[in-house]
Amino acid sequence: MALKTFKPTSPGRRALVLVDRSALHKGRPEKTLVEGLTKKGGRNNMGRITARRRGGGAKRLYRLVDFKRRKWDMPATVERLEYDPNRTAFIALIKYEDGEKAYILAPQRLSEGDTVIASAKCDVKPGNAMPLKAVPVGTILHNVEMKPEKGGQIARSAGAYVQLVGRDAGYAQIRLASGELRMVSDKCMATVGAVSNPDHLNINLGKAGRNRHLGKRPSVRGVVMNPVDHPHGGGEGRTSGGRHPVTPWGKPTKGAKTRKNKSTDKFIIRSRHERKKR
């Protein structure tokens, strides 16, 4: 899909760049596949802020997207492509031959009327899902599971994809966009193709108000706060902070490694940080 630019009739329109969504469905979503979505405003069950800079935004309905693709050997036809406010990718409404409907992530080059299927072995075409042991090496994939039957977790956002680079001893080796090379079980499901809406990274909202519509609030720098609020706060006039950048809780930020899950380190063949070391 192409990008839309606008005539500078106001400061908020001058820099505005949006994705052209004219080819997407213009009506309401499939009623049986949506749920209400309560706004949390970044608060947990105790009412305390656990995610800062969240709040407000337009009301949304949550679309129930099928990330598991476990309806085997049942062809489905793509009824339409839709916008989903809860994610950067577009979604596709599919209808199985037995009449059941579902939402799936729409890959690139999938269009209305196409047929998709999930099977133990099927054609390598966008939207088809199969276990990694049946996928030819070199294939571009998205919505990849990390554990069998858990549902896709890797490469789900707009334009994302991974590449299958090899198989060995019950594991598949995939290369992520970050440069990381990791192993996952070859029983894990993956969907062929790259995720739709690759132009998402070129969007320019043009004004703060559009970010507020998305539920994002302003970000306040620690250096302009008081000492009670942030380690960088205080001082007469503008100060540099006097220490390496830290979070409000004193943890190093800007590049400090935060990964703690040692039990799954064995599945990472090459870290995404190794390119930076060279």
Curated annotation (Swiss-Prot):
A Pfam family hit: Ribosomal_L2
Region (Disordered): 222-278
Bias (Basic residues) ranges: 269-278
Keyword Nucleotide-binding among UniProt keywords: no
Oligomeric form and interacting partners: Part of the 50S ribosomal subunit. Forms a bridge to the 30S subunit in the 70S ribosome.
Primary role: One of the primary rRNA binding proteins. Required for association of the 30S and 50S subunits to form the 70S ribosome, for tRNA binding and peptide bond formation. It has been suggested to have peptidyltransferase activity; this is somewhat controversial. Makes several contacts with the 16S rRNA in the 70S ribosome.
Protein name: Large ribosomal subunit protein uL2
Source species of the chain: Maricaulis maris (strain MCS10)
